[in-house]
């Protein structure tokens, strides 16, 4: 996160250099990063909750390419259609799900002209289905010629989506590996600096006493979408569920 904040212009490095297209560059602000075509989607979104998607993107644009909200709304719709996003341009950020907010951030970066897109822990707060949809979008961006950096600790996601893996530990560079030539065990060992086992002995709780049962729970969210649908589970004594 610290590293991408330097690439994105939020922090300035004490030493070292950044090169963009083989030229040394000074990135002293997010505007500098924007001008270079570097877009960052932070783990904590940089959106104004009381505004809708159109308004958030409008205030992020530094030029006059889009003269009014209708132009921006059309551009949002075009980008969403191209990459398979689902987004309501007129929905307020405060009424959006986490996935929808992330979509707005990505679309904002694309509209601002990002050639390099950096995503900080993009699946940390997404469901597996939302993560799968995001990865489909990322693959389309790759085909479109965009370069993408994903910061994540989820090893299976690293293997599923990346071409190469850059490993850091305690703020230091450790190694760069081709994804096709590594596996979860090697990545885990390099990340923590020692041999680890990913196999865990599981205890059977089939015969344990049931201490909590939930049956067929359903409810609607505040926006009247499905919050829970027919959820059931049992919790056994001594079990971590």
Regions found by a protein language model. Give the residues of each.
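Glycine-rich phosphate-binding loops of nucleotide-dependent enzymes
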Residues: 1-241
């Amino acid at each position: 996160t610290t590293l991408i904040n330097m690439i994105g212009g939020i922090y300035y490095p004490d030493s070292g250099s950044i090169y963009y297209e083989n030229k040394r560059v000074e990135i002293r602000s997010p505007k500098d990063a924007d001008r270079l075509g570097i877009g960052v989607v932070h783990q904590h979104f940089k959106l104004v909750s009381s505004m809708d998607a159109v308004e958030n993107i409008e205030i992020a644009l530094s030029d006059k390419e889009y003269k009014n909200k209708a132009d921006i709304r059309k551009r949002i719709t075009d980008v969403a259609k191209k990459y398979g996003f689902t987004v309501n341009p007129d929905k307020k950020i405060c009424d959006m799900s986490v996935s929808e907010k992330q979509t707005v951030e990505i679309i904002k970066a694309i509209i601002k002209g990002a050639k390099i897109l950096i995503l900080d822990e993009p699946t940390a707060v997404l469901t597996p289905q939302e993560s799968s949809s995001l990865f489909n979008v990322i693959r389309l961006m790759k085909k479109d010629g965009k370069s993408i950096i994903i910061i994540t600790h989820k090893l299976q996601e690293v293997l599923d989506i990346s071409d190469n893996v850059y490993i850091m530990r305690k703020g230091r560079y450790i190694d760069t590996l081709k994804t096709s030539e590594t596996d979860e065990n090697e990545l885990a060992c390099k990340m923590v600096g020692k041999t680890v086992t990913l196999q865990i002995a599981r205890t059977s709780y089939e015969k344990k006493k049931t201490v909590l049962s939930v049956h067929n729970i359903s409810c609607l969210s505040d926006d009247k979408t499905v919050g829970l649908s027919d959820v059931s589970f049992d919790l056994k004594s001594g079990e971590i569920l």
